[in-house]
């Protein structure tokens, strides 16, 4: 009987810990809203100080500009216009953000991950080739799709994904993530452009590359 009680107690503790781990990455709000402010005399929640609720206005939950095309003339031909907590303070603690992504013809959003949020795409214009790769649990399976206006595609949190404009015109996507700060890790930049750089010998062995090739990639990405 004593052993059974110990077993049940251990099980309850493990379940409680598991529940806390599930919610620790994006805490549930304990109030209706916590509008972010730069003032430091308020309550500190989710990395931001909360504005006095009596001073909150509708403008704290509003922004505009996603109708304006982004400049895609530099880099890989992609411009991301993000509405995050910096641009809309009322997003703080709400667990979402939204962005407009503009692609020039041939534009590419390189392989990357969002470590803190899943992402959903709504194609507004153009023709996009998108995909993501599963983890080792599912043998690094590649899932791809060609998307057209009105199509929706979702990318699971933390998995490597990419988006390419394969049409002859500009493409526009409205993207939302399940985090006010989903983070972004561009794979090439992280591996070959870290600060400080990863030892080239490590990367040469990991990717079965010539040492000089690794040095070249590091020069490109750093």
UniProtKB/Swiss-Prot annotation:
GO terms for molecular function: manganese ion binding. PROSITE patterns: GERMIN. Coiled coil: none annotated. Residues 1-24 form the signal peptide. Residues 64-215 form the Cupin type-1 domain. Keywords: Apoplast, Disulfide bond, Glycoprotein, Manganese, Metal-binding, Secreted, Signal. The keyword Nucleotide-binding does not apply. Its main location: secreted. Disulfide bonds join 34-50. GO terms for cellular component: apoplast. The keyword Iron-sulfur does not apply. It is found in: Secreted, Extracellular space, Apoplast. Pfam families: Cupin_1 (PF00190). Glycans are attached at residues 38, 71, 139. Mn(2+) binds at residues 112, 114, 119, 163. Oligomer (believed to be a pentamer but probably hexamer). May play a role in plant defense. Probably has no oxalate oxidase activity even if the active site is conserved. Belongs to the germin family. This is Germin-like protein subfamily 1 member 5. It comes from Arabidopsis thaliana.
């Amino acid at each position: 009987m004593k052993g059974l009680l110990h077993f049940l107690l251990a099980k309850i503790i493990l379940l409680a810990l598991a529940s806390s781990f599930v919610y620790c990455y994006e805490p549930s709000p304990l109030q209706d809203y916590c509008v972010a402010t730069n003032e430091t005399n308020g309550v500190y929640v989710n990395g931001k100080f909360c504005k006095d609720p009596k001073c909150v206005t509708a403008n704290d939950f509003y922004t505009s500009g996603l109708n304006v095309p982004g400049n895609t003339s530099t880099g890989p031909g992609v411009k991301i216009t993000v509405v995050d907590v910096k641009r809309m303070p009322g997003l703080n603690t709400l667990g979402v953000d939204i962005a407009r992504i503009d692609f020039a013809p041939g534009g590419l959003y390189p392989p990357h991950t969002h470590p803190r949020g899943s992402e959903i795409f709504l194609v507004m214009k153009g023709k996009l080739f998108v995909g993501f790769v599963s983890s080792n649990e599912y043998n690094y399976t590649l899932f791809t799709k060609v998307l057209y206006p009105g199509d929706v595609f979702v990318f699971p949190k933390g998995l490597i994904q990419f988006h390419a404009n394969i049409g002859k015109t500009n493409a526009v996507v409205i993207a939302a993530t399940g985090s006010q700060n989903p983070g972004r890790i561009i794979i090439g930049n992280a591996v070959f452009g870290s600060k400080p750089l990863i030892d080239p010998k490590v990367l040469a062995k990991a990717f079965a590359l010539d040492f000089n090739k690794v040095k070249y990639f590091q020069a490109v990405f750093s």
